[in-house]
C-alpha cells in the first residue's frame, strides 16, 4: 500500500541515510532477500536495493499489488548467483564475480512505490523506498551471451507489435554486478547463492495492461509470454 512521505524529522538527508533507512525496512519486514537491483553510482545517486524473495516470480501469470489497473515494468537482464561472494577484506575481481554467476536470464522488474507521489522527492528518499522495486519476473535463460544493445519487441494481445532499440544504461551489462559485489562486500553483506541481480533497464519503463497476454522478444536472446493480474484485496 502507498502512503505519504516520512515525517520531516525522519526523512533521509543524504545517500547514507537513505541506505540505512532501506536496510532498517528490510530488517523490520524480515523477508528473505532474493536478489538485488543495482546500477553504477553517479553524482548524488546510489542505485542499490533489495528484491524480496516473495516478490520474485517465474510463473506465466503474475500477480501485482491489489487495486491497480496496469503494471509498470522495466526490461532487464538478470544474473542468478550460483556461488556465495561473502564479505571479505579483499576486493572481488571481475573474473571471480563471473565465476559465481550460474545463469543469465531475461527479466522484467516490476515497479511501484510506497509513496503516494514521487513528484519532487529527493533521491535519498527514493533510495530509502527501495528505488520503486516491487518485484521481479525471472524469465528464460538467454540463448547467447548478453549484449549491451538489441532490438526489443513486445506485443500486447490484440494490438500491433511495438519495437525499441534497447540499450543498457551503463553500456556493459555486468558492470553494475561487479560494483554491487564489492559494495555489499564492504558493507559486510555479500551476495549469496540463489540470489538474482538486475543491473538496469534496457528500455525505460513500459506500462502494460492487466488480464492481457504480452509477448516479448529480446532480439532473439530470449522470447517469452506472460500476463499480469491484480491480487485480491486482503
Please report, for each region that a protein language model flagged, where it lies by residue.
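Catalytic-core "active-site belt" of small-molecule-metabolizing enzymes
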Residues: 1-172, 177, 186, 207-209, ...
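Short strand-turn-strand beta-turns centered on an Asx-Gly dipeptide
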Residues: 156-158, 199, 219
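Carbohydrate-binding surfaces in secreted/extracellular proteins
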Residues: 216
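Non-transmembrane, aqueous-exposed alpha-helical and coiled segments at domain scale
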Residues: 233-234
Amino acid at each position: 500500500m502507498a502512503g505519504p512521505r516520512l515525517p520531516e524529522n525522519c526523512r533521509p538527508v543524504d545517500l547514507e541515510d537513505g541506505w540505512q533507512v532501506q536496510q532498517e525496512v528490510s530488517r523490520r519486514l524480515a523477508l528473505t532477500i532474493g536478489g538485488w537491483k543495482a546500477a553504477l553510482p553517479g553524482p548524488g545517486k546510489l542505485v542499490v536495493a533489495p528484491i524480496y524473495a516473495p516478490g520474485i516470480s517465474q510463473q506465466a501469470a503474475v500477480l501485482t499489488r491489489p487495486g491497480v489497473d496496469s503494471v509498470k515494468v522495466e526490461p532487464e537482464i538478470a544474473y542468478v548467483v550460483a556461488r556465495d561472494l561473502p564479505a571479505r577484506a579483499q576486493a572481488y575481481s571481475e573474473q571471480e564475480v563471473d565465476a559465481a554467476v550460474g545463469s543469465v536470464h531475461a527479466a522484467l522488474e516490476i515497479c511501484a512505490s510506497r509513496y503516494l507521489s514521487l513528484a519532487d522527492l529527493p533521491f535519498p528518499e527514493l533510495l530509502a523506498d527501495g528505488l520503486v522495486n516491487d518485484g521481479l519476473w525471472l524469465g528464460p535463460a538467454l540463448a547467447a551471451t548478453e549484449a549491451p544493445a538489441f532490438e526489443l519487441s513486445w506485443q500486447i494481445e490484440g494490438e500491433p507489435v511495438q519495437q525499441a532499440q534497447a540499450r543498457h544504461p551503463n553500456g556493459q551489462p555486468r558492470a553494475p554486478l561487479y560494483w554491487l559485489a564489492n559494495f555489499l562486500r564492504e558493507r559486510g553483506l555479500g551476495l549469496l547463492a540463489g540470489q538474482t541481480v538486475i543491473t538496469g533497464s534496457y528500455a525505460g519503463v513500459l506500462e502494460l495492461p492487466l488480464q492481457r497476454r504480452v509477448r516479448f522478444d529480446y532480439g532473439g536472446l530470449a522470447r517469452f509470454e506472460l500476463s499480469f493480474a491484480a491480487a485480491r484485496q486482503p
